[in-house]
Amino acid sequence: MSFDGFFLHHMTAELRANLEGGRIQKINQPFEQEIVLNIRSNRQSHKLLLSAHSVFGRVQLTQSDFTNPKVPNTFTMILRKYLQGAIIEEIRQLDNDRILEFSVSNKDEIGDHIQATLIVEIMGKHSNIILVDKSEQKIIEAIKHVGFSQNSYRTILPGSTYIRPPETHSLNPYTVSDEKLFEILSTQELSPKNLQQVFQGLGRDTASELANHLQIDRLKNFRAFFDQATQPSLTDKSYAALPFANSPENQPHFESLSSLLDFYYQDKAERDRVAQQANELIKRVASELEKNRKKLIKQEQELADTETAELVRQKGELLTTYLHQVPNDQSSVRLDNYYTGKELEIELDVALTPSQNAQRYFKKYQKLKEAVKHLTNLIEETKSTIVYLESVDTMLGQASLAEIDEIREELIETGYLKRRHREKIHKRQKPERYLATDGKTIILVGKNNLQNDELTFKMAKKGELWFHAKDIPGSHVVITDNLDPSDEVKTDAAELAAYFSKARHSNLVQVDMIEAKKLHKPTGGKPGFVTYRGQKTLRVTPTEDKIKSMKI
């Protein structure tokens, strides 16, 4: 784990320099497991992100913007009651562990002095953010409640006494004595795994880097390793407070550990936050897809069962033709089938006359023929629904936080979700704008099916070129105000269509290109569904860096 005690040691120094003595002005909880504090310190405004996420747990200053819930939850309200307007008196790391404490002082509604500690524990799935009364060490509230049935050693509930996580009895590498350190370095194996067991707060990467430093002059190099000044750095798979042996040579320069984390988590945390916000929608779409796929299998089986319709008609025809050869008192008859040149055995109802038996087969044939027509229509409708839901599923997988609400609105309008009590109608956004590589042509991209419909049938002019990944879910893309785009611009548009499709990560994607005037929306068609003929097909390989560089 990159955010280990060693990294937190360096981060604590950064936070102290920027935040100690500062005043907490605003408190928000944009996501289920993350808190953002707006702090004014040294005539500057800072945003402090506290995350109790099981994978991305961390503490950092951030430049990122967040959308906050319209109605704050209980934890946010309690934090505001105790911390809004509070002064941060001290920021302290517990030894070299992944626990950070913010000691604050404030006054309550009647002017009495309040002292509290906001504790951030970064411990994987057990990560937590806990507000504690400093005088009594009682828990006021926590972002995650832990009852006795979950953890008999320490409950994390309002009113419980705060107990620190169990001690591991490992040594703090910053305060261990020279005598003890000499004994360990002289007698113990210095493998990364053993270093993690002996010394507190070392993640796997840090322990591996330390082991490399201890190949010669162990005591001197041990102290030198932990005395190094902070140099924020990316590693081959993560990040570190210092350049490690596996740090890439060419990488951006980071002014602070916080800017390093903003860079590293900008996509990873965003995708996870989208997943949190979109969880209900993803589950609903997955459920509807499963239901419709099962329905399609059943309908296709029923259609297969109607394949006897032609044989039923032939039996009626043969009974009519050879009526005089059909007995009245037998359960079957064998007649020459002039359709095949072979004899055909035909079952009879002994309670009916030969003529009535023939009519019985004709009536059965008519029912089967009507069933074929009905089932064919149902199958087409079910297939259309599956295609639509797959497109929504694709867009949910690629959506930003800002786009989730609009996809939710789409699912409400199409009847897959009900509007929540007092939920307002979400204002529809316009398709996204991208600048082609010629530096002047604007390309529009629909980011959901409502935007796709608006772009294709309301915004696109007749002669403008329209693009869509071939035969797979994806965005509608239109080159605007350029009726004769260059091949380079066409490629740009095709790459956008490929990137914003189910084939985003494919090496070669087929993309259809056609004039917008040749597009047709069938009556009753689902949002985003179009038909067309006469298209040309391009083959492109989209790259994320190019797409991001085109975004306006």
UniProtKB/Swiss-Prot annotation:
InterPro entries found in the cross-reference section: NFACT_RNA-bd, RQC_Subunit_NEMF, RqcH_bacterial
A GO term from the CC aspect: RQC complex
Keyword vocabulary terms for this entry: Cell adhesion, Coiled coil, Protein biosynthesis, RNA-binding, rRNA-binding, tRNA-binding
Transmembrane segments: none
Entries under Gene3D superfamilies matching the protein: fibrinogen binding protein from staphylococcus aureus domain like, ibrinogen binding protein from staphylococcus aureus domain
Protease among keywords: no
Entry superkingdom: Bacteria
Keyword ATP-binding set for record: no
Disruption phenotype: About 25% decreased adherence to human HEp-2 cells, about 50% decrease in binding to immobilized fibronectin. HEp-2 cells treated with mutant bacteria secrete less IL-6 and IL-8, activate ERK and p38 more slowly and to a lesser extent than with wild-type bacteria.
Stretches of the chain forming a coiled coil according to its record: 271-317, 357-398
A single BP term in Gene Ontology: rescue of stalled ribosome
Function: Key component of the ribosome quality control system (RQC), a ribosome-associated complex that mediates the extraction of incompletely synthesized nascent chains from stalled ribosomes and their subsequent degradation. RqcH recruits Ala-charged tRNA, and with RqcP directs the elongation of stalled nascent chains on 50S ribosomal subunits, leading to non-templated C-terminal alanine extensions (Ala tail). The Ala tail promotes nascent chain degradation. May add between 1 and at least 8 Ala residues. Binds to stalled 50S ribosomal subunits.
Quaternary structure annotation from Swiss-Prot or TrEMBL: Associates with stalled 50S ribosomal subunits, binds to RqcH. Recombinant protein interacts with the N-terminal 30 kDa of human fibronectin (FN1).
UniProt record similarity statement: Belongs to the NEMF family.
Note: Repeated attempts to crystallize a full-length protein yields proteins cleaved between the N- and C-terminal domains.
The record's note on its domains: The N-terminus (residues 1-268) and C-terminus (271-552) form 2 separate domains; the N-terminus is globular while the C-terminus is elongated. The N-terminus binds to S.suis cells while the C-terminus binds to human HEp-2 cells. Incubation with the C-terminus stimulates ERK and p38 phosphorylation in HEp-2 cells.
Record's protein name: Rqc2 homolog RqcH
